[in-house]
Curated annotation (Swiss-Prot):
The keyword Zinc does not apply. The keyword Lipoprotein applies. It is a multi-pass membrane protein. This is Gastrin/cholecystokinin type B receptor. Residues 255-285 are annotated as: Disordered. It is found in: Cell membrane. Keywords: Cell membrane, Disulfide bond, G-protein coupled receptor, Glycoprotein, Lipoprotein, Membrane, Palmitate, Receptor, Transducer, Transmembrane, Transmembrane helix. GO terms for molecular function: gastrin receptor activity; neuropeptide receptor activity. The chain crosses the membrane at residues 56-77, 86-107, 130-148, 169-187, 218-240, 339-360, 379-399.
Protein backbone atom coordinates (compact mmCIF):
# COMPACT_ATOMS: atom_id res chain seq x y z
CA UNK A 1 0.00 0.00 0.00
CA UNK A 2 1.21 3.48 -0.71
CA UNK A 3 1.63 5.92 2.13
CA UNK A 4 -0.75 8.84 2.38
CA UNK A 5 0.95 12.22 2.30
CA UNK A 6 -1.01 15.02 3.87
CA UNK A 7 -1.57 18.26 2.03
CA UNK A 8 1.06 20.96 2.48
CA UNK A 9 2.74 23.60 0.35
CA UNK A 10 6.29 23.23 -0.89
CA UNK A 11 8.63 25.53 0.96
CA UNK A 12 10.75 27.57 -1.41
CA UNK A 13 11.78 31.03 -2.45
CA UNK A 14 9.92 33.26 -4.84
CA UNK A 15 6.23 33.85 -5.46
CA UNK A 16 5.84 30.85 -7.75
CA UNK A 17 7.25 28.31 -5.32
CA UNK A 18 4.69 29.22 -2.68
CA UNK A 19 1.88 28.38 -5.10
CA UNK A 20 3.28 25.02 -6.29
CA UNK A 21 2.74 21.63 -4.77
CA UNK A 22 4.13 18.24 -5.80
CA UNK A 23 2.00 16.73 -8.52
CA UNK A 24 -0.69 14.76 -6.76
CA UNK A 25 0.08 14.74 -3.03
CA UNK A 26 -1.81 11.47 -2.63
CA UNK A 27 -0.44 8.38 -1.03
CA UNK A 28 3.15 9.46 -0.75
CA UNK A 29 3.20 11.07 -4.20
CA UNK A 30 3.47 8.12 -6.53
CA UNK A 31 4.12 10.37 -9.49
CA UNK A 32 7.46 11.43 -10.92
CA UNK A 33 7.93 14.57 -8.87
CA UNK A 34 6.66 17.17 -11.34
CA UNK A 35 5.22 20.36 -9.91
CA UNK A 36 1.73 21.58 -10.63
CA UNK A 37 0.48 24.99 -9.59
CA UNK A 38 -2.93 25.87 -8.21
CA UNK A 39 -4.39 28.79 -6.27
CA UNK A 40 -3.40 28.58 -2.60
CA UNK A 41 -6.04 27.85 0.01
CA UNK A 42 -6.08 30.73 2.46
CA UNK A 43 -6.59 29.57 6.02
CA UNK A 44 -6.07 31.41 9.25
CA UNK A 45 -3.45 30.52 11.80
CA UNK A 46 -6.13 29.37 14.22
CA UNK A 47 -7.56 26.94 11.68
CA UNK A 48 -4.14 25.46 10.95
CA UNK A 49 -3.36 25.04 14.63
CA UNK A 50 -6.73 23.40 15.27
CA UNK A 51 -6.27 21.02 12.34
CA UNK A 52 -2.77 20.15 13.52
CA UNK A 53 -3.96 19.51 17.08
CA UNK A 54 -6.81 17.28 15.90
CA UNK A 55 -4.51 15.38 13.55
CA UNK A 56 -1.84 14.76 16.19
CA UNK A 57 -4.46 13.73 18.77
CA UNK A 58 -6.09 11.23 16.42
CA UNK A 59 -2.71 9.85 15.42
CA UNK A 60 -1.73 9.39 19.06
CA UNK A 61 -5.02 7.70 19.97
CA UNK A 62 -4.91 5.32 16.99
CA UNK A 63 -1.24 4.53 17.57
CA UNK A 64 -1.68 3.75 21.28
CA UNK A 65 -4.81 1.67 20.68
CA UNK A 66 -3.14 -0.24 17.84
CA UNK A 67 0.05 -1.02 19.75
CA UNK A 68 -1.59 -1.78 23.09
CA UNK A 69 -4.53 -3.72 21.66
CA UNK A 70 -2.52 -5.92 19.30
CA UNK A 71 0.13 -6.65 21.93
CA UNK A 72 -2.71 -7.72 24.22
CA UNK A 73 -4.07 -10.02 21.50
CA UNK A 74 -0.66 -11.58 20.90
CA UNK A 75 -0.06 -12.16 24.61
CA UNK A 76 -3.52 -13.57 25.30
CA UNK A 77 -3.57 -15.89 22.28
CA UNK A 78 -0.04 -17.01 23.06
CA UNK A 79 -0.61 -17.79 26.73
CA UNK A 80 -4.17 -19.14 26.72
CA UNK A 81 -4.32 -22.84 25.90
CA UNK A 82 -8.08 -22.71 25.40
CA UNK A 83 -7.67 -20.21 22.55
CA UNK A 84 -5.07 -22.19 20.60
CA UNK A 85 -7.36 -23.04 17.70
CA UNK A 86 -6.82 -22.91 13.96
CA UNK A 87 -8.90 -19.76 13.55
CA UNK A 88 -7.09 -17.99 16.37
CA UNK A 89 -3.74 -18.85 14.77
CA UNK A 90 -4.76 -16.75 11.77
CA UNK A 91 -6.06 -14.03 14.08
CA UNK A 92 -2.65 -14.03 15.77
CA UNK A 93 -0.98 -13.47 12.39
CA UNK A 94 -3.46 -10.68 11.71
CA UNK A 95 -2.55 -9.03 15.02
CA UNK A 96 1.16 -9.21 14.19
CA UNK A 97 0.58 -7.54 10.81
CA UNK A 98 -1.52 -4.79 12.42
CA UNK A 99 1.19 -4.20 15.02
CA UNK A 100 3.76 -3.99 12.24
CA UNK A 101 1.63 -1.42 10.44
CA UNK A 102 1.36 0.73 13.56
CA UNK A 103 4.98 0.56 14.71
CA UNK A 104 6.81 0.63 11.38
CA UNK A 105 4.64 3.07 9.46
CA UNK A 106 2.65 5.51 11.56
CA UNK A 107 5.54 7.44 13.18
CA UNK A 108 7.41 7.74 9.87
CA UNK A 109 4.30 9.12 8.19
CA UNK A 110 3.24 11.64 10.83
CA UNK A 111 6.64 13.14 11.68
CA UNK A 112 7.62 14.12 8.09
CA UNK A 113 4.26 15.82 7.65
CA UNK A 114 4.73 17.75 10.89
CA UNK A 115 8.34 18.69 10.15
CA UNK A 116 7.79 19.51 6.47
CA UNK A 117 10.54 17.18 5.23
CA UNK A 118 11.57 13.51 5.33
CA UNK A 119 14.65 13.28 7.56
CA UNK A 120 15.04 9.51 7.94
CA UNK A 121 16.97 8.75 4.77
CA UNK A 122 16.56 6.40 1.83
CA UNK A 123 16.77 3.13 3.80
CA UNK A 124 13.91 4.04 6.13
CA UNK A 125 11.93 5.37 3.18
CA UNK A 126 12.20 2.06 1.33
CA UNK A 127 11.61 0.01 4.48
CA UNK A 128 8.48 1.91 5.53
CA UNK A 129 6.96 1.64 2.07
CA UNK A 130 7.74 -2.08 1.89
CA UNK A 131 6.55 -2.96 5.40
CA UNK A 132 3.27 -1.12 4.96
CA UNK A 133 2.57 -3.03 1.76
CA UNK A 134 3.48 -6.35 3.40
CA UNK A 135 1.28 -5.61 6.41
CA UNK A 136 -1.79 -4.83 4.32
CA UNK A 137 -1.21 -7.87 2.11
CA UNK A 138 -0.80 -10.21 5.10
CA UNK A 139 -3.97 -8.84 6.68
CA UNK A 140 -5.96 -9.44 3.50
CA UNK A 141 -4.62 -12.95 2.92
CA UNK A 142 -5.18 -13.83 6.59
CA UNK A 143 -8.83 -12.82 6.33
CA UNK A 144 -9.17 -14.97 3.21
CA UNK A 145 -7.55 -17.92 4.98
CA UNK A 146 -9.90 -17.50 7.95
CA UNK A 147 -12.94 -17.46 5.65
CA UNK A 148 -11.81 -20.64 3.86
CA UNK A 149 -10.98 -22.35 7.15
CA UNK A 150 -14.39 -21.51 8.60
CA UNK A 151 -16.08 -22.74 5.43
CA UNK A 152 -14.23 -26.06 5.62
CA UNK A 153 -14.90 -26.50 9.33
CA UNK A 154 -18.62 -25.73 9.15
CA UNK A 155 -19.66 -26.86 5.68
CA UNK A 156 -17.19 -29.76 5.15
CA UNK A 157 -16.31 -30.88 8.69
CA UNK A 158 -15.47 -34.53 8.03
CA UNK A 159 -13.17 -33.78 5.09
CA UNK A 160 -11.56 -30.83 6.85
CA UNK A 161 -10.40 -32.84 9.86
CA UNK A 162 -7.67 -34.44 7.73
CA UNK A 163 -5.77 -31.18 7.19
CA UNK A 164 -7.32 -28.76 9.69
CA UNK A 165 -4.50 -28.75 12.23
CA UNK A 166 -2.35 -26.10 13.85
CA UNK A 167 0.72 -27.30 11.95
CA UNK A 168 -1.11 -26.84 8.66
CA UNK A 169 -2.26 -23.40 9.80
CA UNK A 170 1.36 -22.48 10.59
CA UNK A 171 2.39 -23.46 7.06
CA UNK A 172 -0.42 -21.39 5.56
CA UNK A 173 0.55 -18.38 7.70
CA UNK A 174 4.19 -18.71 6.62
CA UNK A 175 3.06 -18.88 2.99
CA UNK A 176 0.99 -15.70 3.37
CA UNK A 177 3.98 -13.78 4.75
CA UNK A 178 6.32 -15.07 2.03
CA UNK A 179 3.81 -14.34 -0.73
CA UNK A 180 3.19 -10.86 0.63
CA UNK A 181 6.92 -10.21 0.84
CA UNK A 182 7.42 -11.21 -2.79
CA UNK A 183 4.39 -9.27 -4.00
CA UNK A 184 5.59 -6.00 -2.46
CA UNK A 185 9.15 -6.13 -3.85
CA UNK A 186 8.42 -3.31 -6.38
CA UNK A 187 7.90 -0.84 -3.52
CA UNK A 188 11.50 -0.69 -2.26
CA UNK A 189 12.77 -0.89 -5.84
CA UNK A 190 10.84 2.15 -7.03
CA UNK A 191 10.87 4.17 -3.79
CA UNK A 192 13.34 7.00 -3.29
CA UNK A 193 13.90 10.23 -1.41
CA UNK A 194 13.86 13.23 -3.73
CA UNK A 195 14.15 16.98 -3.12
CA UNK A 196 11.10 19.09 -3.90
CA UNK A 197 12.43 22.41 -2.67
CA UNK A 198 15.20 24.03 -0.64
CA UNK A 199 15.90 21.69 2.29
CA UNK A 200 12.64 19.82 1.63
CA UNK A 201 12.74 16.06 0.94
CA UNK A 202 9.94 13.62 0.20
CA UNK A 203 9.71 9.83 0.23
CA UNK A 204 8.03 9.10 -3.10
CA UNK A 205 7.37 6.27 -5.54
CA UNK A 206 9.11 6.88 -8.85
CA UNK A 207 7.55 4.50 -11.37
CA UNK A 208 9.19 4.17 -14.80
CA UNK A 209 6.07 5.42 -16.58
CA UNK A 210 2.42 6.26 -16.07
CA UNK A 211 1.43 2.93 -17.64
CA UNK A 212 3.45 1.01 -15.04
CA UNK A 213 1.84 3.01 -12.23
CA UNK A 214 -1.63 2.31 -13.61
CA UNK A 215 -0.91 -1.40 -14.03
CA UNK A 216 0.39 -1.65 -10.47
CA UNK A 217 -2.63 0.14 -9.01
CA UNK A 218 -5.08 -2.09 -10.89
CA UNK A 219 -3.10 -5.21 -9.90
CA UNK A 220 -3.28 -4.33 -6.21
CA UNK A 221 -6.96 -3.47 -6.52
CA UNK A 222 -7.67 -6.91 -7.98
CA UNK A 223 -5.33 -9.06 -5.87
CA UNK A 224 -5.81 -7.41 -2.48
CA UNK A 225 -9.34 -6.06 -2.66
CA UNK A 226 -11.68 -7.33 -5.37
CA UNK A 227 -10.73 -11.04 -5.54
CA UNK A 228 -10.43 -11.47 -1.72
CA UNK A 229 -13.73 -9.65 -1.29
CA UNK A 230 -15.50 -12.02 -3.69
CA UNK A 231 -13.95 -15.11 -2.08
CA UNK A 232 -14.93 -14.01 1.42
CA UNK A 233 -18.44 -13.02 0.34
CA UNK A 234 -19.03 -16.45 -1.23
CA UNK A 235 -17.49 -18.32 1.73
CA UNK A 236 -19.46 -16.50 4.40
CA UNK A 237 -22.62 -16.72 2.32
CA UNK A 238 -22.29 -20.52 2.17
CA UNK A 239 -21.46 -20.60 5.88
CA UNK A 240 -24.57 -18.60 6.75
CA UNK A 241 -26.70 -20.91 4.61
CA UNK A 242 -25.23 -24.00 6.29
CA UNK A 243 -25.80 -22.62 9.78
CA UNK A 244 -29.39 -21.74 8.92
CA UNK A 245 -30.03 -25.23 7.53
CA UNK A 246 -28.35 -26.76 10.57
CA UNK A 247 -30.57 -24.87 12.99
CA UNK A 248 -33.68 -25.79 11.02
CA UNK A 249 -32.56 -29.42 10.75
CA UNK A 250 -31.91 -29.58 14.49
CA UNK A 251 -35.30 -28.04 15.25
CA UNK A 252 -37.09 -30.53 12.97
CA UNK A 253 -35.17 -33.44 14.50
CA UNK A 254 -36.10 -32.32 18.01
CA UNK A 255 -39.76 -32.09 17.08
CA UNK A 256 -39.69 -35.54 15.49
CA UNK A 257 -37.86 -37.07 18.47
CA UNK A 258 -40.29 -35.55 20.96
CA UNK A 259 -43.29 -36.82 19.02
CA UNK A 260 -41.75 -40.31 18.80
CA UNK A 261 -41.02 -40.33 22.54
CA UNK A 262 -44.57 -39.26 23.34
CA UNK A 263 -45.93 -41.98 21.07
CA UNK A 264 -43.75 -44.73 22.60
CA UNK A 265 -44.11 -43.55 26.17
CA UNK A 266 -40.45 -42.58 26.58
CA UNK A 267 -37.14 -44.23 25.79
CA UNK A 268 -36.01 -47.11 27.99
CA UNK A 269 -33.32 -46.36 30.50
CA UNK A 270 -33.51 -42.62 30.03
CA UNK A 271 -31.43 -42.85 26.85
CA UNK A 272 -31.28 -39.85 24.62
CA UNK A 273 -31.28 -39.95 20.84
CA UNK A 274 -27.76 -39.99 19.42
CA UNK A 275 -26.30 -37.86 16.71
CA UNK A 276 -28.26 -37.85 13.48
CA UNK A 277 -26.41 -37.69 10.16
CA UNK A 278 -28.09 -36.46 7.02
CA UNK A 279 -26.62 -34.89 3.88
CA UNK A 280 -23.17 -34.67 5.42
CA UNK A 281 -24.38 -32.88 8.54
CA UNK A 282 -24.17 -34.21 12.05
CA UNK A 283 -25.47 -33.20 15.39
CA UNK A 284 -22.65 -32.71 17.87
CA UNK A 285 -22.35 -34.48 21.14
CA UNK A 286 -22.93 -32.62 24.35
CA UNK A 287 -19.27 -32.61 25.24
CA UNK A 288 -18.39 -30.79 22.03
CA UNK A 289 -20.53 -27.75 22.61
CA UNK A 290 -18.32 -24.75 22.91
CA UNK A 291 -17.89 -21.25 21.69
CA UNK A 292 -15.07 -21.94 19.25
CA UNK A 293 -15.94 -25.38 17.96
CA UNK A 294 -14.42 -26.22 14.61
CA UNK A 295 -17.20 -28.50 13.44
CA UNK A 296 -19.05 -31.66 14.34
CA UNK A 297 -17.16 -34.87 14.94
CA UNK A 298 -18.13 -38.52 14.82
CA UNK A 299 -17.79 -39.83 18.35
CA UNK A 300 -17.20 -43.55 18.74
CA UNK A 301 -18.53 -45.16 21.94
CA UNK A 302 -15.86 -46.30 24.36
CA UNK A 303 -16.32 -49.54 26.26
CA UNK A 304 -15.65 -49.32 29.98
CA UNK A 305 -14.69 -52.46 31.86
CA UNK A 306 -15.75 -51.00 35.16
CA UNK A 307 -19.16 -51.44 36.65
CA UNK A 308 -21.54 -48.70 35.48
CA UNK A 309 -24.01 -47.34 37.96
CA UNK A 310 -26.86 -46.03 35.84
CA UNK A 311 -28.49 -44.35 38.79
CA UNK A 312 -25.45 -42.13 39.31
CA UNK A 313 -24.42 -41.52 35.69
CA UNK A 314 -27.77 -40.98 33.99
CA UNK A 315 -28.32 -37.33 33.15
CA UNK A 316 -31.19 -35.61 34.84
CA UNK A 317 -33.46 -34.24 32.15
CA UNK A 318 -35.57 -31.26 32.87
CA UNK A 319 -37.38 -28.53 31.03
CA UNK A 320 -34.51 -26.05 31.39
CA UNK A 321 -34.73 -22.76 29.56
CA UNK A 322 -31.26 -23.05 27.97
CA UNK A 323 -30.63 -24.41 24.48
CA UNK A 324 -29.72 -28.03 23.86
CA UNK A 325 -26.02 -28.87 23.28
CA UNK A 326 -26.37 -29.24 19.51
CA UNK A 327 -28.31 -26.02 19.25
CA UNK A 328 -25.87 -24.27 21.57
CA UNK A 329 -22.95 -25.30 19.37
CA UNK A 330 -24.64 -23.94 16.25
CA UNK A 331 -25.41 -20.69 18.04
CA UNK A 332 -21.77 -20.50 19.16
CA UNK A 333 -20.65 -20.92 15.56
CA UNK A 334 -23.00 -18.14 14.55
CA UNK A 335 -21.38 -15.85 17.11
CA UNK A 336 -17.89 -16.62 15.84
CA UNK A 337 -18.90 -16.14 12.20
CA UNK A 338 -20.65 -12.88 13.08
CA UNK A 339 -17.47 -11.61 14.75
CA UNK A 340 -15.37 -12.57 11.73
CA UNK A 341 -17.83 -10.86 9.40
CA UNK A 342 -17.53 -7.65 11.42
CA UNK A 343 -13.72 -7.85 11.15
CA UNK A 344 -13.91 -8.30 7.37
CA UNK A 345 -16.40 -5.45 6.88
CA UNK A 346 -14.36 -3.05 9.02
CA UNK A 347 -11.15 -3.97 7.22
CA UNK A 348 -12.59 -3.25 3.79
CA UNK A 349 -14.30 -0.09 5.00
CA UNK A 350 -10.94 1.20 6.23
CA UNK A 351 -9.01 0.35 3.07
CA UNK A 352 -11.58 0.94 0.31
CA UNK A 353 -10.91 4.73 0.23
CA UNK A 354 -7.15 4.13 -0.10
CA UNK A 355 -7.53 1.66 -2.96
CA UNK A 356 -9.99 3.96 -4.69
CA UNK A 357 -7.71 6.98 -4.25
CA UNK A 358 -4.72 5.02 -5.56
CA UNK A 359 -6.58 3.97 -8.69
CA UNK A 360 -7.98 7.46 -9.25
CA UNK A 361 -4.54 8.97 -8.73
CA UNK A 362 -3.00 6.58 -11.28
CA UNK A 363 -5.46 7.47 -14.05
CA UNK A 364 -6.33 11.10 -13.23
CA UNK A 365 -3.69 12.68 -11.02
CA UNK A 366 -4.73 16.36 -11.31
CA UNK A 367 -8.42 15.61 -10.79
CA UNK A 368 -7.73 13.42 -7.76
CA UNK A 369 -5.45 16.09 -6.34
CA UNK A 370 -8.07 18.81 -6.65
CA UNK A 371 -10.80 16.67 -5.10
CA UNK A 372 -8.91 15.01 -2.26
CA UNK A 373 -6.42 17.59 -1.04
CA UNK A 374 -6.82 18.80 2.51
CA UNK A 375 -9.36 17.24 4.86
CA UNK A 376 -10.41 14.31 2.60
CA UNK A 377 -6.90 12.91 2.28
CA UNK A 378 -6.34 13.39 6.01
CA UNK A 379 -9.50 11.39 6.72
CA UNK A 380 -8.41 8.64 4.29
CA UNK A 381 -5.03 8.53 5.97
CA UNK A 382 -6.42 8.12 9.48
CA UNK A 383 -9.07 5.65 8.34
CA UNK A 384 -6.47 3.35 6.79
CA UNK A 385 -4.42 3.32 9.98
CA UNK A 386 -7.53 2.84 12.12
CA UNK A 387 -7.82 -0.66 10.65
CA UNK A 388 -4.93 -1.65 12.92
CA UNK A 389 -6.87 -0.88 16.11
CA UNK A 390 -10.41 -2.08 15.33
CA UNK A 391 -9.75 -5.81 15.76
CA UNK A 392 -8.93 -5.63 19.50
CA UNK A 393 -12.17 -3.72 20.04
CA UNK A 394 -14.13 -6.33 18.10
CA UNK A 395 -12.60 -9.18 20.12
CA UNK A 396 -13.36 -7.49 23.44
CA UNK A 397 -16.98 -6.72 22.57
CA UNK A 398 -17.92 -9.87 20.64
CA UNK A 399 -15.71 -12.71 21.93
CA UNK A 400 -16.69 -13.85 25.43
CA UNK A 401 -13.88 -16.37 25.72
CA UNK A 402 -11.30 -13.77 24.69
CA UNK A 403 -12.56 -11.41 27.39
CA UNK A 404 -12.25 -14.17 29.95
CA UNK A 405 -8.75 -14.99 28.73
CA UNK A 406 -7.79 -11.32 29.07
CA UNK A 407 -8.96 -11.33 32.68
CA UNK A 408 -7.08 -14.56 33.36
CA UNK A 409 -3.91 -13.14 31.78
CA UNK A 410 -4.15 -9.96 33.83
CA UNK A 411 -4.69 -12.02 36.97
CA UNK A 412 -1.64 -14.11 36.10
CA UNK A 413 0.53 -11.06 35.49
CA UNK A 414 -0.71 -9.23 38.60
CA UNK A 415 -1.33 -11.97 41.16
CA UNK A 416 -3.11 -11.08 44.34
CA UNK A 417 -1.38 -11.80 47.64
CA UNK A 418 -2.63 -15.11 49.03
CA UNK A 419 -5.07 -14.83 51.85
CA UNK A 420 -4.10 -16.48 55.13
CA UNK A 421 -6.45 -19.35 55.90
CA UNK A 422 -7.81 -19.37 59.45
CA UNK A 423 -6.36 -22.19 61.52
CA UNK A 424 -8.91 -24.54 63.09
CA UNK A 425 -9.38 -24.27 66.82
CA UNK A 426 -8.11 -27.16 68.96
CA UNK A 427 -11.60 -28.14 70.08
CA UNK A 428 -13.01 -27.97 66.57
CA UNK A 429 -14.25 -31.23 65.08
CA UNK A 430 -12.70 -32.40 61.80
CA UNK A 431 -14.88 -31.92 58.74
CA UNK A 432 -17.33 -34.72 58.17
CA UNK A 433 -17.67 -35.96 54.58
CA UNK A 434 -21.07 -35.32 53.10
CA UNK A 435 -23.38 -37.89 51.60
CA UNK A 436 -22.49 -36.75 48.09
CA UNK A 437 -18.78 -37.18 48.84
CA UNK A 438 -19.39 -40.68 50.17
CA UNK A 439 -21.42 -41.53 47.08
CA UNK A 440 -18.63 -40.34 44.79
CA UNK A 441 -16.07 -42.29 46.85
CA UNK A 442 -18.13 -45.48 46.68
CA UNK A 443 -18.70 -45.09 42.95
CA UNK A 444 -15.00 -44.47 42.33
CA UNK A 445 -14.05 -47.54 44.35
CA UNK A 446 -16.51 -49.77 42.51
CA UNK A 447 -15.49 -48.42 39.09
CA UNK A 448 -11.81 -48.93 39.89
CA UNK A 449 -12.18 -52.47 41.13
CA UNK A 450 -14.53 -53.50 38.37
CA UNK A 451 -16.93 -56.42 38.50
CA UNK A 452 -15.88 -59.19 40.81
Amino acid sequence: MELVKLNRSVQGSGPVASLCRPGGPLLNNSGTGNLSCEPPRIRGAGTRELELAIRVTLYAVIFLMSVGGNILIIVVLGLSRRLRTVTNAFLLSLAVSDLLLAVACMPFTLLPNLMGTFIFGTVICKAVSYLMGVSVSVSTLSLVAIALERYSAICRPLQARVWQTRSHAARVILATWLLSGLLMVPYPVYTAVQPVGPRVLQCVHRWPSARVRQTWSVLLLLLLFFVPGVVMAVAYGLISRELYLGLRFDSDSDSESQSRVRGQGGLPGGAAPGPVHQNGRCRPEAGLAGEDGDGCYVQLPRSRPALELSALTAPISGPGPGPRPAQAKLLAKKRVVRMLLVIVVLFFMCWLPVYSANTWRAFDGPGAHRALSGAPISFIHLLSYASACVNPLVYCFMHRRFRQACLDTCARCCPRPPRARPRPLPDEDPPTPSIASLSRLSYTTISTLGPG
